[in-house]
Swiss-Prot record:
It is found in: Cytoplasm. This is Holo-[acyl-carrier-protein] synthase. Its cofactor is Mg(2+). The gene is acpS. Transfers the 4'-phosphopantetheine moiety from coenzyme A to a Ser of acyl-carrier-protein. Its EC number is 2.7.8.7. Mg(2+) binds at residues 8, 58.
């Protein structure tokens, strides 16, 4: 059963400007493991990587129904890649997190679908 769907779109230029003004954003948004990967990339790929993770985490909190900082922090969420390149998100959700990330020359976007097993979902149906 679908619990929530979230979508986020960010401009790479906005992320680039933020990164130049506030380099600490890397440590605020990316987990230690994500940072390890980030620092192995070229400047162009670093920008795409950071923007994609930023969008993915924003999409998660939209699907979860909260905002960053309220119940979920940036570092509660982690996006790593399988050997195939498929991004996999882990976070404070008891169910399956489906994630898709894409980017172009100017934008990065992510979509998150949160899925719970039907047995995990309580209902208030009247069974008369």
């Amino acid at each position: 059963m679908i619990f929530g769907i979230g979508l986020d779109l960010v401009e790479l230029e906005q992320i680039r400007q933020t990164l130049e003004r506030q380099p600490r954003i890397v440590k605020r948004v990316l987990t230690a493991e994500e940072q390890n990967r980030f620092y192995t990339l070229s400047d162009k790929r670093q920008l795409e990587y950071l923007a994609g993770r930023f969008a993915a985490k924003e999409a998660f909190v939209k699907a979860f129904g909260t905002g960053i900082g309220a119940d979920v922090s940036w570092l509660d969420l982690e996006v790593l890649n399988e050997a195939s390149g498929r991004p996999v998100m882990t976070g404070p959700f008891e169910g399956t997190i489906h994630l898709s990330i894409t980017h172009s020359d100017h934008y990065a976007a992510a979509q998150v679908l949160l899925e719970k097993r039907s047995s995990d979902v309580s209902t208030n149906l009247d069974r008369n």
